[in-house]
Amino acid sequence: MGDIIEGTKPTLDDLWAGDEDQKPQTPPVSPPRSPSFKHEHKSPFPGSTSPPPASPIGEEDLKPRTARASSSTSKVKSRKASPEEFKPVLIDDLPTAWDEAHETFEALEKCVYERKDIGLSKENDEMMVCECVYNRHDPDADPCGPDSDCINRALYIECIAGECRAGKHCHNQQFSKRQYANVDVVLTEKKGYGLRASSTIPANTLIYEYIGEVVAEKTFRKRMQQYADEGIRHFYFMMLQKEEYIDATKKGGIGRFANHSCNPNCEVQKWVVGRRLRMGIFTKRDVIKGEEITFNYNVDRYGHDAQTCYCGEPNCVGTIGGKTQTDIGTMNDLFLDALGITDEVEAMGMKGSKKKKSRQLDEDFVPILRPISAHEVQKVAAAIRQSMENKKMMSRLLQRIQMTDDGAMHRQLMRMHGFSLMYMVLTELADDNEIVLLALESMNKWKLQIRNKIEDSKIEEPVKALSQSGDEKICGLAKQLIEYWSTLELSYKIPRVSKIASLDADDEAGTQTIAEANVVSAARRPDAWENTQEIQIDIAPVRPRTLPVSRPRPPPPPPPLPVKKPALNSMSSTDRLKLDAIIAMAEQTVQAQAAAAAVEATASPQAGSSRSGSRPAEDEERRKRQKRTHMTEEELAEQKERRLRKLIGAVVVKSMNKYKDMMEHDTFKKYARECTDTLVKKEKKRNPSYQDVKHPSLSDDKKAKIKSFTKDYTHKILKHLKEKGKLRNPKSSSSLRTNSNDPRQAASSSTNGDTPSISTTPSQGATQRLRDGELVDDIFGADEDMVMDLDEDTPEMQNDHPAPPSVPPATPPLPPVHVEVVDNVSTPTSQWET
């Protein structure tokens, strides 16, 4: 599969090792070391141990051997030793080390790529669809599950959400949904950090995805040298496919902590998820709680010495690394089953041990190949998809297909996307004439009734190219196939809405490059998750808005006291005091009225301005109502259709807005109108009664259908633009994007940059809705008639008269007046209590 190139971590080309029938036999684990050794995890191991010299090989083992036997059971099966019964040794006494382990690397949620054009799968769209259907009458149904007959699962292809006919009951979306097993990170004594099962894990379960930075060959070589210069001995490289590697040395997931074992309970598998190839660690058998998660590294050393193995298994070979893709000892069970040699390998002990070197395929072990039997078809098809970088393995698998003459097996191979697999072989390995010839000879035996599979798999393209080959035999077979396929008729099938068309756009939007990830991680560094700095913002006090209160003017200062005159008679003096009091009260009343008049005079210009400003608005409303009254039936129908168009257009624009940056603005408006017009025609045809509704609206169900149609429509547009080279590259991160053409945003940024203040702008969601509304008006035009009709429903607009002006609040009462009567004083003194 792939190769982990690391002192103790695997490359991916041949990460297939171990026997599914064997059970682990781990010796007791020593007590964990002290936490002071935490920086010594995966400590350097001693140098490589030279394997013992190979035993002499008989001449008969070097001769190619084939057999026409129908049974795949080896004659040596009777000599196969029965496996010992033993119980796996648990490591549940080891301490967990989540925090310490996470200090050694930077966690990633998913793989990031050096470029977006690497890490892509070579599968055709025809291979992405399975045949599983959910049966609601079967309570034990497990569509696309480990025990089902799902083609996708057999070929290590994940079903597409929304495309699989099992719907929400599909059990083959583990990578997309991140359905990882329950494991703990622990600190071992000799192997550094490791993974431990926190509960019982069934077979064929995804433990964790192998996550890291996907780099090209040149960068991989450069990093190997860089890490060596930095003194890093244990690299975490895994080969994804030819000239592409996953580097989890400094950035990745906890899958990097799974340790090596010569008798592992897990294996690494290469899966197709959408448009990408992804690696996952899967259980080979049931793993009990407390057992360590291990798999066979099969290290290609790339100039580094092999490491000492500490797995402690009875079949331990003593070292990690130095293995090749054809080494029987580390070959995955999938390839052994596909070649039909599992029993023979087990019986003869070809996997090797510390005392015995393992055999090499086609060097010191040439297997007897037999025609494919029914139970081997899925294994052979899956092994072909996994062997694109292993020409020796591919040649052996194609030999088995070529020697199979059973028509039932041919039909099963075609059902397992045989033509699409041959398309991959002829495009990826076109330089190997032996492999090309075997593929053409195999397909020449496959009989068809219709040519639909030929069209879906696109196999005719590479075969036509081979018809011009200089090799006469290859050229003749290619022409023979093309002539045969041309006689077949194409069967018509009812097309259905496919989610596969959206894979390219979804991959473009969901894939992140290393450069983009570095920008985001700089903005969201680990110490930025918590606010540790206090920000002081000075806010000016805000007075409550109240109406002005009339305050009486202070009284004039009292005049100087006159010269006291002799008192008059008592009767005239009392009358004079009463008269003075009456005069003083009258003057106070006059002053209060004058103050109230001044306040009213101050407020009157504002009221007049408000009344004068509302008059044009009232005239405009009256004009709209008159226009509404004199509209013809054709104009009314046109108006309602315009409303429906804008109502649907708002949902369309909102759905397409996600991909707005991937095309020109005018192009976006053009396709938004076309999509809306299509939906309006459908709605008018399905629901002619929309004209009877005064204020039409869309239900949630109808909005969901519009969004789904718009998404598929947009993806087709993006694919069309991409083919014409008019597709724009979206910005790396919307959060880091600045729109210099938006005056509102520029003004906001310039204002906020001066001094800290309380934000008065609307929320992000409100701003986005405002922009969507402006974009809808820009595309479909503003609808004044809709606003007019909505206003007609308000109580204020039920008659032709405007609403009465608001009455200002009454002037607050004057404060009480206390009058002090002074004898022989012509003018009294008044005091205002506040």
Swiss-Prot record:
Histone methyltransferase that trimethylates histone H3 'Lys-36' forming H3K36me3. Involved in transcription elongation as well as in transcription repression. Its EC number is 2.1.1.359. Residues 25-34, 551-563, 802-816 have a biased composition (Pro residues). It is found in: Nucleus; Chromosome. The lineage of its organism: Eukaryota, Fungi, Dikarya, Basidiomycota, Agaricomycotina. Residues 692-703 have a biased composition (Basic and acidic residues). The gene is SET2. One of its GO terms (molecular function) is histone H3K36 trimethyltransferase activity. One of its GO terms (cellular component) is nucleus. It catalyses: L-lysyl(36)-[histone H3] + 3 S-adenosyl-L-methionine = N(6),N(6),N(6)-trimethyl-L-lysyl(36)-[histone H3] + 3 S-adenosyl-L-homocysteine + 3 H(+). Belongs to the class V-like SAM-binding methyltransferase superfamily. Histone-lysine methyltransferase family. SET2 subfamily. This is Histone-lysine N-methyltransferase, H3 lysine-36 specific. It comes from Cryptococcus neoformans var. neoformans serotype D (strain B-3501A) (Filobasidiella neoformans). Residues 775-795 have a biased composition (Acidic residues). Gene3D superfamilies: SET domain, Set2, Rpb1 interacting domain. The AWS and SET domains are necessary for transcription repression. Residues 125-179 form the AWS domain. Residues 305-321 form the Post-SET domain.
